[in-house]
């Protein structure tokens, strides 16, 4: 599907845009941020994230648990920002790669918790004890803030 869309865009003359260098520079700075901080224990943060998501945002969830999880996810973000990686060779740097992956996992965990809070029903692998009914199945649903 993506390939067909790209081909159609090219035929219409949409081509490609030049990258916004301010955005590129900001993302490089964000990616390199852990080198400016004293190395810390990201493994403990990862273990806490796994337990938190299972306990409060797992298959069986409720508003109280997901709200609690969102607060703790903010704490984990802060903890990760304070736990840098050793500054050295940046090629094949597994510590840096793990740190970046963990940051992404925390960000995606926040998205999952926010989206699950918006759903006031239970279906499939999403069961809310405070909304146990499945409710009507909409042909298409969009979750908006």
Indicate residue ranges for each PLM-predicted region.
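Glycine- and aromatic-enriched mobile tails/lids
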Residues: 1-145
